[in-house]
Amino acid sequence: MAIFEGNGTMTVPDTGEIINMTNNGTAIGSLVPQANNTVISYGRENVFSVDDGDTSAITFFEIIQYDHTTLQGRGVVTAVFDANATGSLAPFNGMLVVGIHEEDPSTQTVTIRLWQWQGGIPLPQP
């Protein structure tokens, strides 16, 4: 199990508004059988808007491959946002996202970039 925290920005797809955010969460990972350089992980991430204090969370799944000599990792991410935000994070309610996971062992950082999945079914409006 891994515990993580971070910060970054989120861009609202329809308006381009930039939201400053922090996050924390937990993930469970394991090696993929017969692919010793590949890890799967899944978990929950709490997302907090620095701008207005709004909160949300995502459930995510990742497949990450590592270079065993450098420990650099790269992979793919799928995630879905909870549908409970009421402030600046509300445009992300129920949004399905996909992206990339990049680990840099020299800086001990992970960068995750997510994009709205455009091939999904339309969400019902409240």
Please give the residue ranges for each predicted region.
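Beta-strand-enriched cores of mature, soluble protein domains
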Residues: M1-P126
